[in-house]
């Protein structure tokens, strides 16, 4: 092999190694930042991986919010109509958080099947529903019940005025 071809071969190999390393680093960074969405039914069925950061969403079940009197810890149940999953959160909940509202929680499922959340996101207005939560609720038939309850609540408020 003549020296010019040998030099080109080394350059091509160096470029391939550099691109391979860059792709490997990018994939590793992306893999650590991916938060897959799971419904309460999927979590209850054991489909969500334990110890991996995930997103879970649904409606906060009425009467399920339990606050610790001496800490900021809050336990509540999120449901998609078919199953509910307990979410434990330590911190200040968003102002728009309330029972019957849609939320998305980011955290890890522990060995007891409880989602230990490090972030809770509430709907930013009463008409918005995160797309993943809406699909999960539509699939379980809970979305229609939620809309009927909202319509009845609006009717009650109008008749009270």
Swiss-Prot record:
The keyword Transmembrane helix applies. Belongs to the CcmE/CycJ family. One of its GO terms (biological process) is cytochrome complex assembly. The keyword Transmembrane applies. It comes from the Bacteria. It is a single-pass type II membrane protein. This is Cytochrome c-type biogenesis protein CcmE. One of its GO terms (molecular function) is heme binding. GO terms for cellular component: plasma membrane.
């Amino acid at each position: 092999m003549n020296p010019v071809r040998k030099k080109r071969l080394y350059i091509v190999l160096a470029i391939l190694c550099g691109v391979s390393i860059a792709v490997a680093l990018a994939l590793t960074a992306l893999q650590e930042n991916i938060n897959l969405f799971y419904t309460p039914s999927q979590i209850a069925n054991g489909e969500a991986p334990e110890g991996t950061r995930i997103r879970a969403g649904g409606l906060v079940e009425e009467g399920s919010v339990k606050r610790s009197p001496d800490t900021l810890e809050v336990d509540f149940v999120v449901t998609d109509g078919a199953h509910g999953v307990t979410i434990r959160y330590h911190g200040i909940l968003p102002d728009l958080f309330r029972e019957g509202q849609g939320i998305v929680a980011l955290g890890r499922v522990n060995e007891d099947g409880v989602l230990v959340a490090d972030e809770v996101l509430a709907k930013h207005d009463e008409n918005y529903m995160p797309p993943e939560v809406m699909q999960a609720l539509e699939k379980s038939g809970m979305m229609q019940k939620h809309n009927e309850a909202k319509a009845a609540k609006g009717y009650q408020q109008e008749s009270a005025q």
